[in-house]
Amino acid sequence: MDSSNLSSSMPQEGQLKLTEEAIITIKQVDESSAKRSVSNESRKSKDVTRKEQIASDQQGDDQCPQSDTAKDKKTEFKQDEVPNSNGKSIPTFHPCNNIGINDFNHQHYSRVCRNGIDINLIVVGESSLGKTTFVNSFLQSNDTNFRPKKTMDFVEHKATLSDGDQKFNLTIVDTPGFGDKSDNSNCWRPIATNLLHRLNAYFQNEVKMDRETSEIDSRIHGCLFFINPNGHRLQPLEIYIMKKIDQFVNIIPVIGKADTMTSDELNHFKKRVIADMVREKIRYFREPHNEKKAKIPIPFAIVGAGAPIEHDGKCIRGRAYPWGLVDIDDPKQSDFCQLRNFLLYTHIEGLKHKTHKLIYDTFRTEKLVALNATPGSQFISAEEMNQKYISEQTQLVEEALTKVMKEKYREKENNLELLETNLKTHHKDYKHALKKRITALEEEKNRLIKEIGPEKVKKAGILA
């Protein structure tokens, strides 16, 4: 009995020992997992703290305080099931309370107010269209006697305009006229070179390993192309230059010296300009949905302002004529205010977006494709890219000119051959008529000799 009890108690002691070992092992595993979880939590807390510090450094004053409901309450989501095209339901979650997304506009506005909006413009057009006067008026400068040193000098005007809390870092590049030479086939090159140099500078900084993120964007966002009002439509030289530069910049057509036309003539001229640009497939900047809403009068009709004029106790920016005054700030007399609102308020984001997403991306793709096409290629400087691009464009222009010259030579040669044939025919006819005349005179001579008599003729010495 005792032996049986002893024998029966032996497995229980063995089982008890195994259970204690298992408990010890489980405790060790729990302790190691607890230590691991504590280390993970500390690591996560450090990462979160680091991310919060970076975010706070980047945002600065842009971080807006969340509402009390967002602080005190946890974000709760409501689940809905929306059927898809296959008939299966897809769970969709909607926040039940404020999660801070509605503060994004205020954060963006605060950042823009602190840093300001950078916008770069270039003024292009023929001479004596009031480009420099427009720049001074736009920048609210009284320096109306400023003139560029040379005909093709590029002059940068920089200014900071403010409207309440909003600041505009404005840069306008003045190009003092084209089309003054007898040969204007290459007058577009300085403009295109300047635009390409700015695109290349941005591209070169982008492809560098240690690129400067704080570098100011020098790309041109809009080209104010001044159109000559003397005529019924766009001039061939204006169309030629627009086609050459529309792939590098947003073209904004502007009619200079619009006070030389009546309102009816101006409206008719605007329609003709747009029709010519559409017919010639010139890519000018437009946003149809914004233009209908804001009633944008493209192309803009601009009147230059001279010295300030005092009228009825007010200082007016405009021009004085014998028949009255022209106020450039009056929307009924000039589109100056509409153009300023167009550039600074209604379409500034559209200009910058198209410059970066369309013009620069196309330029960047072409450069990268050309770079990867060369075996063993590496990133080259912007100056070399610019020279290569200009050489390619020059070769294309030379080929086009060679083709045109060959056609003109062939046409001239055909005209000369036709003229030679006409001259030969005329000479043959003249020679035949001359022979007939000689024959007729010989016959008349013989007849006279017979009538007078040979002896009398010989005696008188009439005919030798």
Curated annotation (Swiss-Prot):
Residues covered by region (Disordered): 28-91
Membrane disposition: Peripheral membrane protein
UniProt region (G1 motif), positions on chain: 125-132
Domain of life of the organism encoding this protein: Eukaryota
Binding site for GTP: 125-132, 151, 177, 257-265, 304, 319
Composition-biased stretches (Basic and acidic residues): 41-54, 69-81
Ranges in a coiled coil: 396-453
Region (G3 motif): 174-177
Location in the cell: Nucleus; Forespore membrane
GO molecular function, one term: phosphatidylinositol-4-phosphate binding
Example of a GO cellular component annotation carried by this entry: membrane
Principal location: nucleus
A GO biological-process term: spore membrane bending pathway
Family annotation (InterPro entries): G_SEPTIN_dom, P-loop_NTPase, Septin
Keyword list, A-Z: Coiled coil, GTP-binding, Meiosis, Membrane, Nucleotide-binding, Nucleus, Sporulation
Induction of synthesis: Expressed during meiosis. Expression is under the control of the meiosis-specific transcription factor mei4.
Gene3D superfamilies: P-loop containing nucleotide triphosphate hydrolases
Region G4 motif, annotated ranges: 256-259
Domain Septin-type G: 115-370
Record function comment: Septin-like protein involved in the correct orientation of forespore membrane extension during sporulation.
PANTHER family per the UniProt record, alphabetical: SEPTIN
Family: Belongs to the TRAFAC class TrmE-Era-EngA-EngB-Septin-like GTPase superfamily. Septin GTPase family.
Subunit structure as annotated in this protein's UniProt entry: Component of the sporulation-specific septin complex composed of at least spn2, spn5, spn6 and spn7.
Protein name per Swiss-Prot or TrEMBL: Septin homolog spn5
Upper lineage: Eukaryota, Fungi, Dikarya, Ascomycota, Taphrinomycotina
